[in-house]
Every structure is written in structure tokens, then in C-alpha cells.
């Protein structure tokens, strides 16, 4: 990215910050609590960026002084070595700050702070694909535990030999979507299934969709568009299983989206969960349609969330997980144990770099 473009954006941010400072000092603003809170929040959001930019300017001045010292220290080996070391340290800090400032200039995604509905569907591979879907579910549950997130299954279709034909997990916590959005797509596994007697390696797939939770204000649903029915559902056990219809089957007629929810103990709770899933699915559908109208280059980026894209292969024989978007390998056991931080960080970095290039191109 052109440094002059970055500097112009940072100078504009500083001007905005200074204007906010003046507004906050205005007595008429102090008398309006709502406006005061809005301006104070915006000031707090911009302050780290402004402080980093001021530090970068200070580093530039210190770098020039160190260069001058280096010129003047010719013939004095000890002083020259000190000047070289200082230049190295200053250059390293400048590089880190430059990168941080570039990323900070990217438009924020308002969905990043949201919790998610994570849907896993068994794909090609029959029973083995269902088992693989179960393995992926455990991987995400372990990662969520590491992050301190809450995980609740809200809809599940279990397979006869284990695993799931389909599973939807509600994962709630801070900035869940910002991390898990990179998991959307086709996950392929290459391994010898437990049901394979000849020891042959099979290839199976499961599809992951990551949908930010949608508030009722985000998605308007006309009750006339819903077809809701109930069914008997397994649950707490005993006579309740056979006599009480707690499962909810919800159909959104305009889109054909169907949600079957059985995990809660009451029909009312299952209906609420089904509506949560439907809102998330409708919001995801709107976003997919909007993305389809964008350029092919934009849709191909790391964080596109295209559920038909093969994003990763898990090779048991070689103990290797390959992320095809990054062209990088990661230890299989580490990934399956839910230690996804390195992988997610690499995806985030690649996504940010691509967006920076797009931002610079759009401004040129």
C-alpha cells in the first residue's frame, strides 16, 4: 500500500479527533448527555490510532537523529555499533507500527462482535462423513472452551453409527464471528474409517456455515410467511417423550428454509431457538446474495464465507492439516484438539492484507 495514501488517511483521522476534542469541550455538548456519550465513544475509538500515529512521527524523528549520529561516528567503532543497534530497533518498531496503523484504517465489520450459529452438515462419504461432522463439532467446542465462549446445541440430526447428519451450535461470547467466520466452507478429511476393514484411505467431507446471530430488528419476518408444526421429541426421558409434542418444525415459505428444533425441553423454548436459527439463516442468505453481486476477486478472499469453497484438508496419514486459501500446513492433532489460534491468526492476516490492497486500489 502506498505510504502517502496511509499518511493522508491518518492525517484525516487526527483532524477528526481534534474536532471531537473541541466539541467535547463545548459546554452545550456537556449539557446533552446523549450527544456527549456518542462523541466520547468516537473519541475513545480513535484515540489509540492517533497515539500510534504520533508515536510513528516521533520514531521518524529519532530515526533521522540516529542516522546523523551514525554519519558522525565514523572512525569510532563503539559509537558506530551503538548507532547501528539503535537504528535497527527504531526500524523494527516503525515497521510494526506501520502495519498496525494500516490494519486500523480498514473499515470495521459490525458483525465481528456477534455470537454465531455454526452449522455443520455431513457431505460426501456416507457414515464416515457423519462421523467427521462429529469430529469437527468437538474441535469447535474445544476451541470455544479455550476462548471462554458458551456452546449450546440448538438442532441436531444424529447418525446411526455416530456423529451427525446435521448439527447447529449456538456459540456465544465476545467477538465470536471475528474468529469463526474463516471456518465457513468445505472441510475434507482423508483417513482410514473405523468401518473400513481393508485399511483403505477414504475421502469424506463436511460443510460448515457460520452465521452471525441476527436480532429481530436485523431481519423482519412476517408471521404469515411461517408454517409451524410440532412433533414428539426425545429429551428428558420417561413418559414425557411419547406424550408431549415439544419439537418444532418451522418452514419459511418464501425461501423454503426449514428449521427443526428438538434440543430444548419445552415447545416454547424450541420455537424461540428455531426463530433464532431462521433469522441467522435469512441474514446469511441476504449477505450471500449481496456477495454474489461483487467481483469474483472479492468473493475469493479468505473471509468470503462461501460454503461451497473447499477450504481445508485434514490428512491423518501425514498428520497434516492444509489450509488451501493460505497454502500452509498445520499439525493435525493440534488443530483437532481445538487449538485454532495460529490458523485463525494466519487467516486474519491474509484477509487484512487483501483488504488493504483493495482499499488502496479503490483510492488510487
From Swiss-Prot:
Q: How is it modified after translation?
A: Methylated by PrmC. Methylation increases the termination efficiency of RF1.
* Annotated region (Disordered), positions in chain: 292-326
Q: Name one GO molecular function term.
A: translation release factor activity, codon specific
Q: List the PROSITE patterns hit by this protein, alphabetically.
A: RF_PROK_I
N5-methylglutamine (modified residue): where?
Answer: 239
Q: List the NCBIfam families.
A: prfA, PRK00591.1
Task: Give the similarity note.
Answer: Belongs to the prokaryotic/mitochondrial release factor family.
Q: Which protein is depicted?
A: Peptide chain release factor 1
Amino acid at each position: 500500500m502506498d505510504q502517502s495514501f496511509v499518511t493522508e488517511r491518518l492525517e484525516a483521522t487526527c483532524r477528526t479527533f481534534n474536532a471531537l476534542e473541541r466539541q467535547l469541550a463545548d459546554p452545550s455538548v456537556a449539557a446533552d448527555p446523549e450527544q456527549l456519550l456518542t462523541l466520547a465513544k468516537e473519541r475513545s475509538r480513535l484515540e489509540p490510532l492517533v497515539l500510534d500515529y504520533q508515536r510513528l512521527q516521533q520514531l521518524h524523528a529519532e530515526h533521522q537523529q540516529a542516522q546523523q549520529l551514525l554519519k558522525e561516528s565514523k572512525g569510532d567503532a563503539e559509537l558506530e555499533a551503538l548507532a547501528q543497534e539503535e537504528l535497527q530497533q527504531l526500524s523494527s518498531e516503525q515497521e510494526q507500527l506501520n502495519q498496525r496503523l494500516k490494519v486500523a484504517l480498514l473499515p470495521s465489520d459490525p458483525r465481528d462482535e456477534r455470537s454465531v450459529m455454526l452449522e455443520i452438515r455431513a457431505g460426501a462419504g456416507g457414515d464416515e462423513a457423519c462421523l467427521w461432522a462429529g469430529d469437527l463439532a468437538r474441535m469447535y467446542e474445544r476451541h470455544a472452551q479455550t476462548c471462554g465462549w458458551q456452546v449450546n446445541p440448538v438442532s441436531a440430526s444424529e447418525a446411526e453409527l455416530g456423529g451427525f447428519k446435521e448439527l447447529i451450535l449456538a456459540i456465544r461470547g465476545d467477538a465470536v464471528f471475528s474468529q469463526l467466520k474463516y471456518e465457513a466452507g468445505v472441510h475434507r478429511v482423508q483417513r482410514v474409517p473405523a468401518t473400513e476393514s481393508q485399511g483403505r484411505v477414504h475421502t469424506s467431507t463436511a460443510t460448515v456455515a457460520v452465521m452471525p446471530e441476527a436480532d429481530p430488528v436485523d431481519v423482519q419476518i412476517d408471521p404469515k410467511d411461517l408454517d409451524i408444526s410440532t412433533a414428539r421429541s426425545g429429551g428428558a426421558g420417561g413418559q414425557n417423550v411419547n406424550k408431549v409434542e415439544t419439537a418444532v418444525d418451522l418452514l419459511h415459505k418464501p425461501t423454503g428454509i426449514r428449521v427443526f428444533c428438538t434440543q430444548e425441553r419445552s415447545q416454547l423454548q424450541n420455537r424461540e431457538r428455531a426463530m433464532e436459527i431462521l433469522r441467522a439463516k435469512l441474514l446469511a442468505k441476504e449477505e450471500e446474495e449481496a456477495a454474489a453481486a461483487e467481483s469474483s476477486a472479492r468473493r475469493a478472499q479468505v473471509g468470503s464465507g462461501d460454503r461451497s469453497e473447499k477450504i481445508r484438508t485434514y490428512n491423518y496419514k501425514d498428520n497434516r492439516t492444509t489450509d488451501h486459501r493460505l497454502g500452509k500446513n498445520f499439525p493435525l492433532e493440534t488443530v483437532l484438539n481445538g487449538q485454532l489460534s495460529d490458523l485463525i491468526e494466519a487467516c486474519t492476516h491474509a484477509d487484512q492484507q487483501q483488504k488493504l490492497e483493495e482499499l488502496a486500489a479503490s483510492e488510487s
